[in-house]
């Protein structure tokens, strides 16, 4: 196919040989399947802020570190240069998170290069070598749902131990990839976490707890459709409580149960949570409608 203008410079620089096809167009980026030598990869082109439906909400960008003091001042003032720097920081956040999580052992797409607002990374595939489906497009047996849920809860823990909260984790941004078996053994399917530009620093962001609880609840609600027993679990508060106490490790046993302490109710906080939940539900319904269309 004819390369989109944003990929032409990467072709000229020899980072991409050919563009095969468009894979998807989402709320924050367009993704293309490309050939790089003998390998097939994907190129993620980030949309400009004016063309994105996902806002750079202050909840996500709070306390993100900016190395250049001039850039930090410009971003604080909201100048044209500051907005450009803020956009660049938003895009590079996913690259930073991918490298950080890969180093921590979290299954994410392997990043290869980031140039001119384009991220070159691994094309995650299924057993036939085609682009892997999102969880939202797959039906599971109860046993599969329990297994994949356990894997993803462990990945959330691993991410948190690395200091990262995804912030928008759901069935829409997790792929079901196939890993070939060794020496003729049968391969296995497993989840791969994608879409990380909104990932937040667990220790530096005041909204990290709420985001982690929402991420874990999304996993419970999705897999609970196939394994209803999961709907009675409460992993999110348990994970965060252990993290706050300094007791959370990659191999920390979890029960899925959490006893909440009774305290005076902060009605303003409750109302804020209700408003947030309504907004998240509206966004979730929009994503489902877009996926169905």
What role is predicted for each listed range?
Residues 1-131, 161:
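Conserved ATP-binding subdomain of kinase catalytic cores across diverse folds
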Residues 1-25, 143, 147, 151, ...:
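Regulatory N- and C-terminal appendages and interdomain linkers associated
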Residues 35, 176-180:
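Short, low-complexity Ser/Thr-rich regulatory SLiMs
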Residues 88-95, 149, 209, 213-216:
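Amphipathic alpha-helical transducer elements in NTP-driven molecular machines
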Residues 124, 194-200:
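Activation of the activation-loop gatekeeper triad in protein kinase-fold domains
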Residues 129-141:
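AlphaC helix of the protein kinase catalytic domain
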Residues 161-171, 176:
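Catalytic-loop of the protein kinase fold
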Residues 200-207:
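Short beta-alpha connecting loops at secondary-structure transitions
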């Amino acid at each position: 196919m004819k390369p989109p203008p944003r990929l032409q410079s990467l072709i000229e620089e020899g980072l991409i040989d050919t563009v095969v096809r468009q894979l998807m167009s989402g709320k924050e980026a367009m993704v293309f399947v490309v050939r790089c030598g003998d390998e097939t990869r994907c190129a993620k082109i980030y949309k400009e802020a004016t063309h994105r439906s996902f806002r750079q909400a202050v909840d996500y960008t709070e306390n993100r570190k900016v190395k250049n003091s001039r850039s930090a001042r410009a971003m604080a003032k909201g100048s044209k240069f500051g907005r450009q720097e803020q956009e660049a920081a938003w895009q590079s956040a996913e690259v930073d998170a991918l490298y950080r999580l890969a180093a921590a052992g979290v299954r994410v797409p392997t990043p290869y290069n980031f140039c001119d607002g384009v991220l070159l990374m691994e094309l995650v595939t299924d057993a036939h070598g085609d682009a892997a489906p999102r969880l939202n497009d797959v039906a599971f047996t109860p046993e599969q749902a329990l297994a994949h849920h356990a894997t993803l809860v462990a990945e959330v823990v691993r991410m948190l131990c690395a200091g990262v909260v995804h912030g928008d984790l759901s069935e829409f941004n997790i792929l079901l990839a196939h890993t070939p078996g060794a020496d003729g053994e049968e391969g296995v399917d497993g989840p791969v976490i994608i879409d990380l530009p909104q990932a937040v620093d667990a220790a530096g962001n005041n909204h990290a707890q709420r985001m982690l609880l929402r991420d874990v609840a999304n996993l419970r609600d999705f897999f609970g459709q196939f394994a209803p027993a999961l709907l009675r679990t409460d992993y999110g508060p348990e994970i965060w409580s252990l993290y706050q106490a300094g007791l959370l490790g990659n191999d920390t046993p979890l029960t899925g149960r959490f006893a909440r302490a009774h305290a005076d109710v902060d009605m303003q906080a409750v109302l804020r949570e209700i408003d947030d939940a309504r907004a998240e539900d509206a966004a979730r319904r929009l994503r489902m409608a877009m996926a169905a269309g």
